[in-house]
Amino acid sequence: MDPFRFQVEARAGRARVGRLFTPHGAVETPLFMPVGTAGSVKGLMPKDLEAIGSQVLLANTYHLLLRPGPERVRALGGLHGFAGWKGPWLTDSGGFQVMSLGHMRRIDEEGVVFQSHLDGRLIKLTPERSIAVQEALGADLIMAFDECPPYPSPREYLEASLERTLRWLERSLKAKTRPDQALFGIAQGGTDPELRRRSTLETIRFDLPGYAIGGLAVGEPKEAMFAMVELSTRLLPEDRPRYLMGVGHPEDLVAAMGLGVDLFDCVYPTRTGRFGSALVPEGRLNLKNARFLEDRRPLEEGCDCYTCQTFGRAYLAHLVRAGEMLGGILLSLHNLRHLHRLTEAARQAIREGRYGDFAREFARRRFGREVPPWFREALAAGGHW
């Protein structure tokens, strides 16, 4: 039997609950993946992540290629043996980090030559090299090498980029040798509907185990972003998981889940925590604010995370203002649990056929009377508003 299967178990409008089977266990979707950039989620141990309901972790190919190197990770048991997380892993292709972090020297048909942000050495990353690195790392879910254009980009560049990404997908697929890893293709096209449609349809032709919506959440307006998510989920096959890359704001998750997105990842919840802010249903609490210094309440009433069950806002505000490492750890733990509770509640609402009620209640608490048009339109397109 194929170690990778995806089955839809419940629907409400275009939202769906699914089960994704991998060699390291089955997971329920929609789900949010914490980002373990260098093989660890900053400040959190695997047992912490398991306790708060994390199901899949993401690691960055670019960072692990530079340090400690893929062959060392392979020799030490792959990510599952090396990093201590025994559940499923996903690795990205390295393309986005090359474009955003590396001092890129050249991009051509062969691949990308960039300068390491660590030591300045020149490194060449091609589709074949990206797949080889990801096979050495041993994640369950791996990504085809792609080019993520910045926003805004001229239409001519977007078109050339998406065509190159399709050719790189073909090369990624030919380079793949491990049957115990599932390769996802990434659709690009920016916010141009025609190019996004073309990229998505051409990517689907490869008949892959899953598909990613790439090139969004890079600075474009929310209206444009969700128009592309709506178009993409309408075109992508119903029987394969859909992954919206780099998206982690709660309101974005609620809108995208309503359109049928299954997988998400983002550094937002942990980075926000390290910067001293907590996610709550009304938005964010900036614990640097003096008004929290005598506030005994937990960050979020009803939250079952260790942070909320143990500490008040006053203590957390003290840690943040004192620059204590524990402050960022406790806030990161809460923020991830906040997103996991959100996806858990979404799955329950979908199973009970009331995703629209769930989304409207979320909007009432998050936005009050000023619900942004993009949010309403996305939910309406999913059959929930």
Curated annotation (Swiss-Prot):
Substrate binds at residues 92-96, 146, 188, 215. Residues 246-252, 270-274 are annotated as: RNA binding. Belongs to the queuine tRNA-ribosyltransferase family. One of its GO terms (molecular function) is metal ion binding. It comes from Thermus thermophilus (strain ATCC BAA-163 / DSM 7039 / HB27). This is Queuine tRNA-ribosyltransferase. Pfam families: TGT. The gene is tgt. NCBIfam families: Q_tRNA_tgt, tgt_general. Homodimer. Within each dimer, one monomer is responsible for RNA recognition and catalysis, while the other monomer binds to the replacement base PreQ1. SUPFAM superfamilies: tRNA-guanine transglycosylase. Its cofactor is Zn(2+). Signal peptide: none annotated. Pathway: tRNA modification; tRNA-queuosine biosynthesis. The lineage of its organism: Bacteria, Thermotogati, Deinococcota, Deinococci, Thermales.
